[in-house]
């Protein structure tokens, strides 16, 4: 089952930004319980030039279905607001 998601932002605090961890909102998932079933799945983002960056969902973020995905190499800023595929 493939799910589309939107990249919301980097994981960050007031002073630090973790560029290899992204907050992703899967479409049609609106609760923490549904999002917890996605932990361990692969996340794929395709750049406009054709590069493919892969990450893994590591935990839930918040109560409305967002998740955190860790990538080996961080996503560029142009990925913010773009779609990813959750496999």
From Swiss-Prot:
> Superkingdom, according to UniProt?
Archaea
Kindly list the GO CC terms recorded for this protein: ribonucleoprotein complex; ribosome
Gene of origin? rpl35ae
Species this protein is from: Pyrococcus horikoshii (strain ATCC 700860 / DSM 12428 / JCM 9974 / NBRC 100139 / OT-3)
Specify the protein name.
Large ribosomal subunit protein eL33
Q: Which residues form the signal peptide?
A: none
Q: NCBIfam families under this entry?
A: PRK04337.1
Looking up HAMAP family in the UniProt record yields: Ribosomal_eL33
One Pfam family recorded for the sequence:
Ribosomal_L35Ae
